[in-house]
């Protein structure tokens, strides 16, 4: 049961981030960004912490679990088109994040989370905004540009909590062994 605890908490964290972001994306701050741009990058933090601490296999479990729970709540809390766009973009981008993270994980501690989050955020942004808003009168292209700029800034800022959380997990006496399954 102890081995499932990180996955359980990862899934809960991911589901909360997805559901909150899917509601927040409907509330623009200005013509360039919505509130969702400030909350969603935390999903990449959750994925990267799980990947670094517990392995790619467990990170994927968190992504799949977070996807299922997040989509259910998103359908309930947000517009169906937002939920569909979110699910598609989330699943694609998070799995790419895990893949890229593992390819560059032997570099310095900050490169894997920054590079993987930057690339997968671009994919997430294009998929989400084109599915959610294409054909609407909303300024979704400028929202997408602003969203990606925020995601890049957040990828950099979230390196601090990434390092702190990894240090805490690494220093715990009862650490769950990292799954090295690709």
Locate the predicted segments by residue:
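Hydrophobic transmembrane alpha-helices
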Residues: 1-54
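Membrane-interface helix-boundary motifs at transmembrane edges
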Residues: 2-3, 51-59, 103-108
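Cytoplasmic-side transmembrane-helix entry/capping segments in multi-pass membrane proteins
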Residues: 6-11, 57-68, 108-115
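Residue-level recognition of pore/gate-forming positions within transmembrane alpha-helices
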Residues: 15-18, 66-70, 121
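Structural signal for membrane-spanning alpha-helices in multi-pass inner-membrane proteins
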Residues: 18-26, 73-77, 128, 132, ...
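Interfacial aromatic-anchored transmembrane helix boundaries in multi-pass membrane proteins
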Residues: 23-35, 70-89
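A glycine-rich, hydrophobic loop/mini-helix early in the fold
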Residues: 47-77
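Membrane-embedded alpha-helical hairpins and interfacial helices in multi-pass inner-membrane proteins
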Residues: 83-182
């Amino acid at each position: 049961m102890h081995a499932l605890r990180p996955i359980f908490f990862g899934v809960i964290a991911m589901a909360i981030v997805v559901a909150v972001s899917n509601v927040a994306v409907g509330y623009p701050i200005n013509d360039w960004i919505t509130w969702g741009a400030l909350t969603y990058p935390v999903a990449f933090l959750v994925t990267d912490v799980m990947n670094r601490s517990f392995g790619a296999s467990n990170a994927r479990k968190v992504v799949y679990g977070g996807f299922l729970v997040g989509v259910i709540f998103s359908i309930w809390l947000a517009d169906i088109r937002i939920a569909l766009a979110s699910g598609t973009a989330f699943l694609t981008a998070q799995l790419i994040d895990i893949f890229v993270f593992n390819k560059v994980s032997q570099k310095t501690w900050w490169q894997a989370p920054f590079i993987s989050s930057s690339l997968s955020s671009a994919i997430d942004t294009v998929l989400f905004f084109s599915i959610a808003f294409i054909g609407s009168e909303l300024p979704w292209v400028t929202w997408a540009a602003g969203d990606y700029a925020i995601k890049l800034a957040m990828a950099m800022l979230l390196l601090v909590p990434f390092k702190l959380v990894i240090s805490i997990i690494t220093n715990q006496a009862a650490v769950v062994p990292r799954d090295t399954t690709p």
